[in-house]
Amino acid sequence: MNPNKALWEKGAFTEIAAFMHQSGEELVKSLGIKPPLRVLDLGCGDGTTAIPLARLGAEVVGIDIAQNLVDAGNKRATEAGLNRLTFQEGDACNLQGVNNHSFDMTISVFGAMFAPKPFDVAREMVRVTKPGGRIVMGNWIPNDPTSFVSQLLKISAAFTPPPPEGFISPMTWGVESHIIERFGQAGVPKEKISMVKDTYSFISNNK
């Protein structure tokens, strides 16, 4: 089995994602979504971003490597009555079965950043997005003193073994030079790439 798939299927990510729904909703509101729009949510989890996209009228396909998260996403979509939203299993590094230029927008919020081959991820995101379409990523920023996640990882690193040789930290997706290099190799000119720093809050005690 793909070790990345095994890792994500082992955890209880749906419980963690419940505290992150606000981030997906706030990001989606900022994108000016107007139907008809076909969107791919890559590394979608159980629908943190895909569900608010579909509620705004977009046709959304969510792809995640973990089958349990795909099942949870389809369950949430059915319960919400969102018949233009589907979830399916897939690998962000190799989107087999997804045709070139299939989507008006490809989005990934705290998802594809965890795939082990970032240059392949960038290439695939560009490949499946229509010319003139948009690619949107939400990624954590390393060494940010205001970031809960950054500080949590810094603390945990002191108590865990070093990563294996060749490991590429997902936090590198929060570094401007890496983003430009990865999408540049996928054919996106530097002047077409822009970055915005923002802060989203975890929901605590339903507040």
Where are these regions (language model features)?
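Conserved class I S-adenosyl-L-methionine
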Residues: M1-L37, T48, P52, A72, ...
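Short glycine-centered segments of the SAM/dcSAM-binding site in methyltransferase folds
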Residues: R38, G133-R134
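Class I SAM-dependent methyltransferase SAM/SAH-binding core
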Residues: R38-L42, D46-L95, D120
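A short acidic, Gly/Pro-enriched loop at the edge of an enzyme's catalytic core
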Residues: C93-M105
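A short SAM/SAH-binding and catalytic strip from SAM-dependent methyltransferases
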Residues: D104-P118, I141
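Helix-to-beta-strand junctions that scaffold the AdoMet/dcAdoMet cofactor pocket
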Residues: A115-P116, T129-P131
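Conserved catalytic/acceptor-binding region of the Class I
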Residues: F119, V126, R134-S204
